[in-house]
Regions:
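Periplasmic/ER-lumenal interhelical loops and adjacent helix-loop junctions
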Residues: 45-68, 72, 90, 94, ...
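A cross-kingdom signal targeting lumenal/periplasmic-facing segments of multi-pass membrane
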Residues: 98-99, 514-616, 620-629, 633-674, ...
Length: 951
């Protein structure tokens, strides 16, 4: 039976291609039917679409310059983040580069072509591995269906298409190992590791873990006599090839290493329990094995039910040969999935998520390839064992579904179909396999229907409309900036009215080629992340997703923001000193709106001078509001002798202090308790903060009458959110009745609760202006500990006001201080005039260089509103000058009296060293290849000589 189904490569390729086309049409055809693109999810517009457009333009320019003999690739871009190196967004995937260049004007089509072609290549890679390891061709064809069309791919990778490359690289990497060990051919292995070295570092780390495990398990299971010496001999060749590949990739790998270690990407502030998850996670794991639900964070499996039978078939078979390897891997992956330690280990303890479950998909697919032929030759006793374990699994699934209060997935019907096929058609094995292939295909269609169909899970609603997606990537609000006739270098900002739009318009600058004070990149510079947290910026999705600087007047001016766009119909926080200069009628998703363009009347260029400085140690003692005002008076430095020290002066006033705010909250809660006859309040004020027993609690703060004009802030210092569930607060929920019935009802409701990776949202509103801040909970994926939070309501005229605070998140909110601030703008104009007296003119950015001219009457500190980074080198009149970190995340250098030419040059840190290492390694590989060819040639000649002698 094994030999009868060993097909030629051509036949397998034709059958696979036909099958892929049919399944792709059935699964993704509904996107065309419903008018949806393949750009969707939380990061679809801001990262997937933005990356396609940016890389398309970048590589068009790069290859265009190359054709004209100009080799000076851009490695730094002011539009990337707040001004960062392009490695944050640059991709090295050849297919994505081609798609980007071909479809730069139609990113939606480019993403679709890239995604579907990547899936096709992933299937080819899987089949190549199966063929080399002598798997049954038909079983491989059945398994490849499950490898490509599963819950992980359909729920996650379609929206985050960069992760599809893992499905291509993993089988090729393991195929490379087999070729290296069996044939001493290292080409494929080196190519895979090289690509991982220039790609995402996290992918390299994860694949290295899998590779290490593969080599260890391979040696232990395939060698009867085991020893340390034998193991070292087994892995020496892969280790050398691995190092050669990393050395070859050093020109990109070393700069990426520097980028990662100097970034603000954070994991948990406090690592929680490493051994056990909450009950809800294990319930999700059981149902998510063949279902569509998420497991933990970004974790999906949704494998074919045929894999369930294959698992039970595996563990009822004798542990010999490949069966033994698969059993060991099953235990390893089970432990990874069952323990939080596995999640931390898969990310190098830099985060907490379950993306590593893609490895389980590969495992289950290989399991089907190996076990399907054996199932068709199984005896009665083994069938009974498999069916017994299957029955236990089904009972567990039913119990968990009842516990979760969810319906049992009708995907289980396919499990019975597979079992029936196995029982009835086993004697006609070839016919049985054809039926299994049809069932597997139908199962894929059902899975896709469950996930995407609007009447089911409706995940397709998360994807952008195909008619408007390209315009949405560019962002409608940016269109008015094209009318600006201004040759100077400046930044722009787009003001939106709610958190949803903030998230949709993340990476605003990068998507339009404009410079702005935002950025959504996994490896944002640590100085940027630390500064925005220190300043209490509330408009952040997570520590490295900065929407903007919250429309704060001083921060915009100090950052070189000159123009703003805003919809007239939206109620937004407007900074002080901006003048309306243009209006434009636009169509925003079917709604007629008026787009407005404002110009900052107090705009500073990217480079301006200070005559005084404030020591960083003094600056750190100030509250977020004072820090903003201090930077208008003196540049913040560690220390300097270039300019005198300045003691900042403040004119802000706290119109409500902590005691007043907490008193008002207590009165509201007492009134609510009296009205609802509650013994225990839904929200309690303690000495260290607030305990919120119910989510969605709305608090109202009455501000003093006859407010004077100024910028208004709500500031909360050292805020920390500790999530709690209903069981934690059962005393509150059972205060009216404590019957067994009430307790059971509470228990049922609490099953949907989880304290893992929880986040709260604090929404504030003043005079119709709403601001929402995301607050990640203790031990969550992006927990950074306590932080300052400042909500800016913009510049408001003298009016009465009532400030509302809505706490969306059950748990404890601890803080050291809370107050409402009025910041008058009386001194702002004077401070601006002082800063704008001596500025750098004729600023130009070209070929990784920033140049400009300045004339000063005395010694001053020149502040450069570009994020500080080691890659910059400064020259004043051609002489190298030391750059200092200023104002938390910007740069500064001293300038003497007189006229000066300023030049900043950017080089990727580690690029020169990496170039040398890559060059040396390339020569080593070439020399080794030449020697190998000569050796083979000599062996061939020797064999020919001996043959002639015998003749």
């Amino acid at each position: 039976m094994e030999e009868s189904l060993k097909w030629s490569k051509r036949r397998v390729l034709l059958l696979y291609t036909a099958l892929f086309l049919v399944l792709t049409a059935g699964v993704f055809g509904r996107f065309i039917y419903y008018g949806k693109s393949l750009i969707g999810g939380a990061d679809g517009l801001s990262q997937v679409g933005a990356s396609m457009v940016y890389n398309g333009k970048y590589y068009r320019e790069f290859f265009g310059n190359l054709l004209h003999g100009q080799f000076s690739p851009k490695v730094w871009d002011l539009s990337v983040g707040m001004g960062m190196d392009v490695t944050h967004i640059l991709i090295w995937n050849p297919l994505q580069i081609i798609c980007g260049m071909l479809f730069v004007e139609n990113a939606s089509l480019g993403v679709a072509v890239f995604t579907l072609t990547s899936l096709y290549l992933a299937g080819l890679a899987f089949l190549a591995y199966c063929r080399y390891t002598k798997c049954n061709s038909y079983a491989a064809l059945v398994a490849v269906i499950t490898y490509l069309f599963n819950g992980y791919i359909l729920n996650y990778c379609i929206a985050q298409n960069v992760f599809i490359e893992l499905y291509i690289i993993l089988p090729l990497l393991l195929l490379g190992v087999e070729k290296l060990q069996k044939e001493k051919k290292s080409g494929l292995f080196i190519a895979c590791v090289f690509y991982l070295g220039i790609s995402l570092l996290l992918n390299l780390y994860t694949m290295t873990l899998i590779l290490a495990g593969y080599l260890i398990v391979r040696y232990c299971c395939r060698n009867e006599k085991k020893s340390i010496k034998g193991f070292l001999k087994e892995i020496i060749s892969p280790m050398i090839s691995y190092c050669m590949a990393i050395g070859l990739a050093a020109v990109v790998f070393i700069p990426k290493i520097y980028l990662s270690v100097t970034s603000g990407r954070v994991g948990n502030a406090e690592i929680g329990n490493l051994l056990f998850y909450e009950k809800k996670y294990y319930a999700d794991l059981i149902t998510g094995l063949t279902g569509t639900n998420e497991i933990g964070i970004h974790g999906f499996i949704g494998i074919s039910t045929l894999a369930v039978l294959s698992v039970f078939m595996l563990y009822t078979s004798k542990a010999e040969g490949r069966i033994k390897e698969l059993k060991v891997w099953g235990v390893i992956l089970a432990l990874m999935a069952l323990m939080p330690l596995g999640s931390y280990l898969s990310t190098g303890f830099l985060g907490f998520n379950h993306r590593f479950l893609f490895a389980c998909i590969f495992y289950f697919s290989i399991l089907i390839v190996v076990m399907l032929p054996k199932m068709l030759m199984a005896g009665i006793q083994q069938k009974k064992k498999v069916f017994a374990w299957t029955s236990i699994y089904l009972v567990a699934l039913v119990l968990v579904s009842l516990w979760k209060k969810t319906s049992l997935s009708y995907m289980m019907a396919f499990l019975f179909l597979y079992m029936g096929c196995w029982l009835i058609l086993q004697e006609n094995k070839k016919y049985c396999l054809w039926v299994v292939l049809c069932i597997a295909s139908a199962e894929v269609f059902s899975l896709a229907y469950t996930i995407y169909e609007p009447t089911q899970k409706g995940y397709i609603s998360k994807f952008e409309d195909s008619k408007t997606v390209n315009k949405d990537i560019q962002i409608q609000a940016s269109s008015i900036f094209k009318t600006i006739r201004d040759s100077s270098v400046y930044r722009v900002e787009d003001i939106v009215s709610n958190e949803k739009e903030n998230n949709r318009e993340a990476n605003f600058g990068t998507r339009n080629g404009y410079s702005s004070l935002d950025g959504y990149y996994s490896y944002m510079y640590a100085d940027i992340v630390n500064t925005v947290e220190d300043m209490g910026i509330s408009q952040m999705g997570n520590p490295f997703n900065i929407y903007d600087l919250d429309e704060r007047t001083a921060l915009y001016t100090l950052g070189g923001v000159k123009y703003l766009s805003v919809y007239k119909e939206d109620i937004t926080a407007m900074p002080y000193g901006y003048k309306l200069i243009k209006e434009k009628k636009v169509d925003d998703h079917g709604k007629k709106k008026t787009l407005q363009l404002y110009q900052n009347q107090y705009a500073l260029p990217l480079m301006y001078t200070y005559s005084t400085y404030i020591p960083a140690k003094d600056y750190l003692k100030l509250n977020p509001c004072q820090k903003e005002q201090a930077m208008l008076q003196g540049v913040v430095l560690e220390s300097t002798e270039a300019v005198p020290r300045k003691k900042p002066e403040f004119n802000s006033s706290n119109i409500l202090v902590k005691e007043q705010i907490e008193t008002q909250i207590k009165k509201q809660m007492a009134k609510k308790a009296k009205q609802e006859e509650l013994q225990k309040l839904p929200l309690e004020v303690g000495t260290n903060g607030i305990t919120c027993y119910e989510t969605g609690m709305k608090l109202e703060l009455q501000l003093p009458e006859d407010l004077e004009a100024g910028e208004y802030y709500l500031c909360i210092e050292n805020l920390r959110y500790v999530p709690k569930n209903r069981i934690d607060f059962q005393e509150y929920y059972l205060q009216k009745e404590k019957t067994q019935y009430e307790k059971k009802v509470l228990l049922k409701k609490s099953r949907a609760d989880s304290n893992e990776n929880q986040r709260a949202k604090i929404t504030t509103e003043l005079q119709g202006i709403k601001k929402t801040a995301v607050l990640w909970g203790k031990d969550s994926q992006y927990d950074i500990g306590s932080r300052n939070l400042l909500f800016n309501f913009g510049y408001l005229d003298s009016k009465k006001g009532k400030l509302t605070i809505t706490l969306n998140g059950r748990g404890e909110y601890t803080y050291s201080n809370i107050y409402v601030v009025r910041q008058p703008m009386d001194s702002y104009q004077k401070e601006y005039q002082e800063l704008s007296k001596y500025i750098v003119k004729n600023v130009e950015i070209k070929n990784n260089r920033i140049t400009g001219d300045i004339k000063v009457p005395d010694r001053r500190m020149l502040c450069i509103a570009i994020p500080y980074h080691k890659g910059f080198t400064a020259f004043v009149d051609g002489e190298k000058t030391k750059l200092e970190k200023a104002n938390g995340m910007y740069m500064a250098l001293p300038v003497e009296k007189g006229h000066h030419t300023i030049e900043l040059e950017y080089n990727l840190p580690g690029q020169k060293v990496g170039l040398v290492v890559s060059g040396i390694m390339l020569m080593v590989i070439i020399v080794l290849q030449i020697r190998e060819k000569r050796r083979k040639g000599a062996q061939k000649d020797e064999g020919y000589y001996k043959f002639n002698q015998i003749s």
